[in-house]
Amino acid sequence: MLQVVQSPHNLVFMGSIRSVVACLSLAAVARKMTAATGQSVSGTSAAAAGLLRLTSVPGYDHNRVNDVLLLRPAAETQRRCDNETQNLQDGNDHVVFFPGDIQNFQQEMALQPDAAPWQCWSLERVGLTLAHRFPGCHIWVIRASQMYLHKFSCYQNFVESNLFGAPEHSADYGAIRHLRALLGHSMQQAGLPNPLPPLSGTSTPGPLPAGFSLTIVGFSKGCVVLNQIVYELAGARADPELQLFLDRVSALYWLDGGHPGGSETWVTDKCALGELASSGVAVHAHVTPYEVRDPMRAWVGREHRHFIKTLEDLGARVSHKLHFEDEPASIDNHFRVIQEF
């Protein structure tokens, strides 16, 4: 999360050694990924990196659309996995990533003075990093539907939000339904062989594709979508189609969640967390001092601790880690958690 109280120019750490190191590390990841695919990541064309950009993909209603970036599994990795495990779900493992503030497509970041220094965390670069982290999976990067001042991500299609992206959570906004439909339409547009079927609205829905599994990752502002999903779990389970979809979610990753609101950075409602715990989904929380040790936003750390303790008390499958705990809090390390988790 970019802190609104600061000048945008103060957020740009032009001379940061850590930023340079992080960008070089990302470049190394990109080279490794493209060596596996035989493709290039140089230049501004996402297609050159094996990335497919889908624009204005609709969700469950045509008023909610998102741009989506897809990186298919490297063919070599997929063949190796298929040979090792007969029931590898036919390459039907998927990872959905919700980015944070300032993260956008590379070309668009290059045009914005405040965003240009952070191009190594563009949607394309992060997609390549995630492909390295989750080999053999389809990587889906969901661009926020609005970017106020080209910096502040707003996930209005998933959760009621103000211009700066601060959420107002509810139990029935439709984030899960939108994600289910958005992913299905994206698969169809990308020409994947086993797409999710369209939502039918019937009480006896057809089965999902064999072996379909989903991991959902949120970073910084993107964690508001995961929080909204948690608040919707109880209601969504009453819907047969959404229940089938939720049953295929294997893991949720919160990466240094943050937003400009004054509370609810982490879910603390015990009933909502009870639904999450009973789902059996693996919960992973990775944080840095930038968010959980900021004295000006002390509630973030308190809420994070409450989130973890409540889930542990409820018997959830939860893991957590504080990264860079011996280093000063910095926005550089905030971004680097994407590499380290």
UniProtKB/Swiss-Prot annotation:
Pfam families: C2orf69. Keywords: Electron transport, Mitochondrion, Respiratory chain, Transit peptide, Transport. It is found in: Mitochondrion matrix. Residues 1-35 form a transit peptide. GO terms for cellular component: mitochondrial matrix; mitochondrion. Disulfide bonds: none annotated. May play a role in the respiratory chain. Belongs to the C2orf69 family. This is Mitochondrial protein C2orf69 homolog. It comes from Danio rerio.
